[in-house]
């Protein structure tokens, strides 16, 4: 039976970077668990800001967080008050010097994670799942994506038996490593239970320029 590999993990080192970039010789497990908790808590705390991803770097005894968000103003706050408050809280918790970089997501309509969270939010507000899926797909295509697939799973419309439905428009070359495919997952907590939302967004191919070796000069010699 065929299974689908995670599109992000499949392309790590090819056209996708690691989201935790550090190495230590001891206490690796503790720092890894700390990374997971930090990412989870920041996503929950900054839910209104539309956080797409949180990347972690640990240069020396410092902690650097790179937050990609659709609404950076909510995180920064007036005159930087909110981000300073967040930084102080993290420094107190981790006992490290913390640096926070905020990167704006220019087109949230093409970000798979934000699309999944938006659909989940609509499902929690009792919007029909087909309508929510179609609206997200139409919006992504309008902003220039080459292909998009949305899949929802669970007790759709409150049915007794859980099922999955999906909607696909355009191309989605999952086996092509150079394809820039973004993947997102979110959960909608409804009165009937949890509905899972998965999105795949194909934004085109990434071609890496090959390094050209200098060629020897070609000439003619007359003896």
Curated annotation (Swiss-Prot):
NCBIfam families associated with the record: rpsC_bact
Sample GO molecular function, one term: rRNA binding
SUPFAM superfamilies hit by this protein: Prokaryotic type KH domain (KH-domain type II), Ribosomal protein S3 C-terminal domain
Job of this protein: Binds the lower part of the 30S subunit head. Binds mRNA in the 70S ribosome, positioning it for translation.
Protein name: Small ribosomal subunit protein uS3
Sequence similarity: Belongs to the universal ribosomal protein uS3 family.
Keyword terms, alphabetized: Ribonucleoprotein, Ribosomal protein, RNA-binding, rRNA-binding
Every KH type-2 domain range: 38-106
GO cellular component, one term: cytosolic small ribosomal subunit
UniProt-listed HAMAP family: Ribosomal_uS3_B (MF_01309_B)
Cysteines paired by S-S bonds: none
GO BP term (any one): translation
Organism encoding this protein: Acidobacterium capsulatum (strain ATCC 51196 / DSM 11244 / BCRC 80197 / JCM 7670 / NBRC 15755 / NCIMB 13165 / 161)
Quaternary state and interactors: Part of the 30S ribosomal subunit. Forms a tight complex with proteins S10 and S14.
CDD domains given in the database record: KH-II_30S_S3 (cd02412)
């Amino acid at each position: 039976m065929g299974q689908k590999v995670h599109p992000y993990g499949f392309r790590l080192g090819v056209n996708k970077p690691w989201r935790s970039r550090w190495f230590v010789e001891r206490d690796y497990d503790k720092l890894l668990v700390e990374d997971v908790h930090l990412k989870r808590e920041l996503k929950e705390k900054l839910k209104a800001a539309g956080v797409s991803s949180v990347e972690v770097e640990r240069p020396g005894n410092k902690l650097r967080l790179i937050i990609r968000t659709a609404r950076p103003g909510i995180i920064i706050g007036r005159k930087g008050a909110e981000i300073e408050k967040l930084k102080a809280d993290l420094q107190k918790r981790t006992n490290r010097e913390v640096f926070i970089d905020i990167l704006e997501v220019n087109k949230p309509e093409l970000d798979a994670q934000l699309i999944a969270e938006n659909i989940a939010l609509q499902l929690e507000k009792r919007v029909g799942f087909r309508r929510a899926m179609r609206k997200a797909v139409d919006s992504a295509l309008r902003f220039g994506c080459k292909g998009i697939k949305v899949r929802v799973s669970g007790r759709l419309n409150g049915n007794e038996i859980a099922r999955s439905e999906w909607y696909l428009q355009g191309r989605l070359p999952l086996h092509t490593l150079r394809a820039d495919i973004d993947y997102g997952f979110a959960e909608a907590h409804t009165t009937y239970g949890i509905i899972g939302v998965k999105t795949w967004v194909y934004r085109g191919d990434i071609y890496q320029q090959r390094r050209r070796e200098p060629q020897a000069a070609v000439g003619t010699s007359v003896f």
